[in-house]
Amino acid sequence: MSYDKKADVTSLDEDLRQLRESKFSPEAIQNIKIWVYKSVLKEIAPPGDLLECLKDGTVLCKLANILYEADTGEANHISWKSSKMPFVQMDQISQFLSFSRKYGVPEDELFQTIDLFEKKDPAIVFQTLKSLSRYANKKHTDRFPVLGPQLSTKKPRPPVKSKPKHLQDGTGWSTFEYGYMKGASQATEGVVLGQRRDIV
């Protein structure tokens, strides 16, 4: 028996990551890139990998500022700068994530800083942007297109009809709803409490 061979098993995190990645084809990633640059930033998308374009956090901060301005009319909500220093880039990514959380993106659809900066989980980065587009579209339908299906709106529950008058007599037991017990009690049903029972 050989112990050198690696077991053919994967962790749950790895399985979930692969499942997420399978949902984003190159075409889907390109659509996300178009949404970020053309639809929101009104810029020409640079060539190359989308994650590399987003890695320094400047594009994400500009994206957040535009969405914030559309809501409040205030510009430059997040300060940013082009920098090659890792801690500056990661801080800018973190600021974008804080904005997205307040904007409405669910916690389970938000990536972590290292998912983008170290490319640990590209799919969740794409999922965050896709989710952000849905919330932006919900708030400003005419300005920001949506990636994928729109957010569903919760429909109010239909009104519950009140009970008929013959069921509203205030009794604790309704024979119309629960049946008639025919005066059942412990004595009539042979229920013995605290005494010996003979089971035949």
Swiss-Prot record:
Residues 151-164 are annotated as: Interaction with SH3 domain of ABP1. It holds the Pfam family CH. Residues 154-165 have a biased composition (Basic residues). Changing S185D: Moderately reduces actin-binding and actin-bundling activity. This is Transgelin. Has actin-binding and actin-bundling activity. Stabilizes actin filaments against disassembly. It comes from Saccharomyces cerevisiae (strain ATCC 204508 / S288c). The keyword Phosphoprotein applies. GO terms for biological process: actin filament organization. Keywords: Acetylation, Cytoplasm, Cytoskeleton, Phosphoprotein. The modification N-acetylserine is found at S2. The keyword Plastid does not apply. Present with 1578 molecules/cell in log phase SD medium. GO terms for cellular component: actin cortical patch; actin cytoskeleton. The modification Phosphoserine is found at S11. InterPro entries: Calponin-like, CH_dom, CH_dom_sf, SM22_calponin. Residues 144-168 are annotated as: Disordered. GO terms for molecular function: actin filament binding; protein-macromolecule adaptor activity. It comes from the Eukaryota. It is found in: Cytoplasm, Cytoskeleton, Actin patch. Residues 26-136 form the Calponin-homology (CH) domain.
